[in-house]
Structure formats: structure tokens, C-alpha cells
């Protein structure tokens, strides 16, 4: 039996609950508090991601990512359907003010790179 896909929208019965799947099981992820979350992603094997990273990605309002195609593979594998926004060296100057504005409005945003931890050899350092 396959787990039902996750939804980035709040459950009408519990507005603070979001979900993701792991090994075919549907798991709960609380809605993330407002703020910027730096989330490390696996280098090579998607199965190496941490439970905390999955909870964070499922719980945030926006996932700012280096390459949406790469991050989409990760989010689809774990049934995380959230709003992916590109944030990389070619659009950082334009995207950064928008992200900062959303943060000021109370959004929760995860910053991820294609592999590894944001800020290590990428443009994330200017946002943080």
C-alpha cells in the first residue's frame, strides 16, 4: 500500500500539520515557525537525508533552492509538495530582496543547495 501524497497546505482539521512520506509511511511535520532554515541535502544518495531535514522541508512555506529540478527530485521522492523558488548565483541579486521581504512578513523558508550544506561554496552566504 502506497502512502498518500503530502500536501503543502494546512490540513483543515489541524492547520499546523503537514506531511511527508518515508519508506511508504505517511509522517507528520509541524508547520515551521517563521524564519530562515538552512537545510543540508544528501551528497549522492537521497536516502542519506535526515528526518529533521524532511520535517523542515515539509513544514516550511517556501524552499529556496539552487536548482529546482534537482530539489524537485528530492521533494518528490518524499512526497513533499511545497513551493520551490530558485535561488542561485545568476538570480541571487533579484531573488534575495524578495526572500527577505517574505521573511519579514512571517514566512518560513528553507535554503538548500543541490548537495551538501548551504553556504559551503555557494551563494547562500549573502542571504544569511
Where are these regions (language model features)?
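Conserved helicase ATPase core of P-loop NTP-dependent helicases/translocases
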Residues: 94-100
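Catalytic-core regions built around general acid/base machinery
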Residues: 53-59, 102, 126-128
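Short glycine-cluster motifs
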Residues: 104-128
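Glycine-rich, flexible N-terminal cofactor/catalytic loop recognition
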Residues: 8-90
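Short helix-loop hinge/linker segments at domain boundaries
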Residues: 75, 101-104
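N-terminal acidic, proline/glycine-rich, low-complexity intrinsically disordered segments
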Residues: 1-8
Amino acid at each position: 500500500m502506497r502512502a498518500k501524497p503530502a500536501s503543502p497546505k494546512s490540513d483543515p482539521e489541524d492547520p499546523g500539520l503537514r506531511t511527508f512520506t518515508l519508506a511508504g509511511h505517511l509522517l507528520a511535520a509541524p508547520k515551521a515557525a517563521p524564519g530562515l532554515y538552512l537545510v543540508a541535502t544528501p551528497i549522492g544518495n537521497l536516502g542519506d537525508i535526515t528526518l529533521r531535514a524532511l520535517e523542515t522541508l515539509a513544514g516550511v512555506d517556501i524552499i529556496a533552492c539552487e536548482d529546482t529540478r534537482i530539489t524537485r527530485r528530492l521533494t518528490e521522492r518524499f512526497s513533499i509538495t511545497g513551493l520551490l523558488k530558485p535561488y542561485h548565483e545568476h538570480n541571487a541579486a533579484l531573488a534575495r530582496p524578495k526572500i527577505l521581504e517574505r521573511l519579514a512578513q512571517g514566512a518560513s523558508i528553507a535554503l538548500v543547495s543541490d548537495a551538501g550544506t548551504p553556504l559551503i561554496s555557494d551563494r547562500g552566504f549573502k542571504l544569511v
